[in-house]
């Protein structure tokens, strides 16, 4: 509900199964009936339409908007050539991917993560079409199988790409790299586990000042309408957030045997909780100067 404030105390969670589980389906509405509610002084308009399953975007330094059309396997560029707030140039930059999602850019390459690989394509600022074929950076299955949570989001920091990989299922023991954030060195092509126990860390970003990694996580279902809260949190190398054996600290997941090596694990508590089953799907740190002063800090 826009404007409503929620406070969820991690030390006062309800007990598992103490609230009923609720299943809600979505209703697809015509865009003219779906005006976003925004604070006074803000305005939202349609920047682009008639896209096919757009799932993620990345804005380049010159304002070009890269869009992952996941179902079609394409990366598009949207450009506003007359600065009226509406894109008037749409081009397919590259295609042939398997459900592309994550997009990142540096001074030399456009990086793309799909369910099969992390890719790179030579890129010059302002370029509208790829001049060469995408280059595979990871090995086969290095980002897991395509079943379950299929989005592979990425963020670039100091020549390393951090890749969020969700679990295959709701609760279960799964092999790496499922339910992790992976760290990939673009200079050496070395891949390591960065953090674990994250059921679906679908959104990921770098704080512009501290240069720390943050993520939003979609938590598990099946324990009632008020468990388990989704969350936003900073992530450090080696962190374990509990899934599937624990949640929100050392709260034990019912009906699953905890292997001996996890019984004394230090489970990191997340920083900010969202209402259970909210399903946050991304985050971005705003570092521009258009917003009122009270919205900074």
Model-derived segments and their meaning:
Residues 2-39, 151, 167-170, 179, ...:
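Beta-propeller domain segments
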Residues 72, 87, 115, 131, ...:
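A detector of repeated loop/turn-to-beta-strand junctions in beta-rich toroidal repeat architectures
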Residues 74-77, 109, 117-119, 180-182, ...:
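A short loop-to-beta-strand structural motif that recurs across blades of beta-propeller domains
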Residues 50-62, 95-109, 113, 143-160, ...:
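Beta-rich, blade/repeat-based domains predominating
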Residues 66-68, 112, 162-165, 212-217:
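Residue position within the beta-strands of beta-propeller blades
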Residues 76-108:
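Blade-loop segments of beta-propeller domains
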Residues 89-90, 99, 104-106, 116-157, ...:
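Asp-box/WD-like beta-propeller blade repeats and closely related beta-sheet repeat scaffolds
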Residues 78-83, 121-129, 235-242:
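Short loop/turn segments immediately following beta-strands, especially the blade-tip
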């Amino acid at each position: 509900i826009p404007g409503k404030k929620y406070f969820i105390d991690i030390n006062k969670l309800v007990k598992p199964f103490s609230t009923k589980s609720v299943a809600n389906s979505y209703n697809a509405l015509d865009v003219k009936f779906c005006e976003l509610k925004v604070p006074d002084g803000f305005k939202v308009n349609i920047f682009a339409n008639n896209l096919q399953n757009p799932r993620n975007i990345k804005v380049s330094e010159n304002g070009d908007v890269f869009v992952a059309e996941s179902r079609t396997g394409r990366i598009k560029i949207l450009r506003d050539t007359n600065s009226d707030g509406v894109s008037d140039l749409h081009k397919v930059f590259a295609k042939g991917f398997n459900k592309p999602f994550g997009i990142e850019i540096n001074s030399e390459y456009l990086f793309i993560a799909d369910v099969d690989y992390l890719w790179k394509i030579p890129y010059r600022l302002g370029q509208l079409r790829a001049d060469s074929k995408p280059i595979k950076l990871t090995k086969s299955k290095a980002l897991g199988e395509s079943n379950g949570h299929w989005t592979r989001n990425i963020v670039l920091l100091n020549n390393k790409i951090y890749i969020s990989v969700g679990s295959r299922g709701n609760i279960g023991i799964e092999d790496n790299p499922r339910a992790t954030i992976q760290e990939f060195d673009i200079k050496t092509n070395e891949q390591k586990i960065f953090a674990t126990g994250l059921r679906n860390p679908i959104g990921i970003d770098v704080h512009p000042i501290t240069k720390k990694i943050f993520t939003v996580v979609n938590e598990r279902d099946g324990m009632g309408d008020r468990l388990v809260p989704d969350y936003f949190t900073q992530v450090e190398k080696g962190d374990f957030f509990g899934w599937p054996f624990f949640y929100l600290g050392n709260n034990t997941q019912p009906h699953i045997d905890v292997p001996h090596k996890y019984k004394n694990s230090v489970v990191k508590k997340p920083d900010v909780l969202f209402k259970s089953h909210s399903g946050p799907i991304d985050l971005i740190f705003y570092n521009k100067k258009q917003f009122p002063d009270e919205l900074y800090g």
